[in-house]
Structure formats: C-alpha cells, structure tokens
Amino acid sequence: MTIKNKTINLIENKKPVVYPIFTFRWLAVHALAVPTVFFIGSITSMQFIQR
C-alpha cells in the first residue's frame, strides 16, 4: 500500500463524531448566563415600578 492509498483509506473509514450536548463548558456557561439574564430582567423591570 502506498501512502496515498493509506490516506484515502483513513478518509473513507472516518465515522461521524457524536458530541455530547451537556458538557462541562455548557454547564459553566449556563450556570453564569441564566442568573445574569434573570437579574438584568428584574433590575430592568424595577425601573418601571411606580410609587
């Protein structure tokens, strides 16, 4: 087998990669983003409270 044939075999035998949805990065981003959006929304809504 030549180098070219080996390269073609490696490309043809590649299986699709399945990535997990919930990774540590996903959890870290959402652990910060969800409360941030909540607090920004609550602070914004407080601006419209009438006495």
From Swiss-Prot:
Name of the protein described by the UniProt record: Cytochrome b559 subunit beta
Membrane topology: Single-pass membrane protein
Family listed: Belongs to the PsbE/PsbF family.
Any one of the GO BP annotations: photosynthetic electron transport chain
UniProt keyword Chloroplast present: yes
Entry function: This b-type cytochrome is tightly associated with the reaction center of photosystem II (PSII). PSII is a light-driven water:plastoquinone oxidoreductase that uses light energy to abstract electrons from H(2)O, generating O(2) and a proton gradient subsequently used for ATP formation. It consists of a core antenna complex that captures photons, and an electron transfer chain that converts photonic excitation into a charge separation.
Residues involved in heme binding: H30
Cofactor note: With its partner (PsbE) binds heme. PSII binds additional chlorophylls, carotenoids and specific lipids.
Parts of the chain that traverse the membrane: 26-42
Gene: psbF
Cofactor field: heme b
The keyword Chaperone is annotated on this UniProt entry: no
Cellular-component GO terms for this entry: chloroplast thylakoid membrane; photosystem II reaction center
Gene Ontology MF, one: heme binding
Keywords of the record: Chloroplast, Electron transport, Heme, Iron, Membrane, Metal-binding, Photosynthesis, Photosystem II, Plastid, Thylakoid, Transmembrane, Transmembrane helix, Transport
Native organism taxonomy: Eukaryota, Sar, Rhizaria, Cercozoa, Chlorarachniophyceae
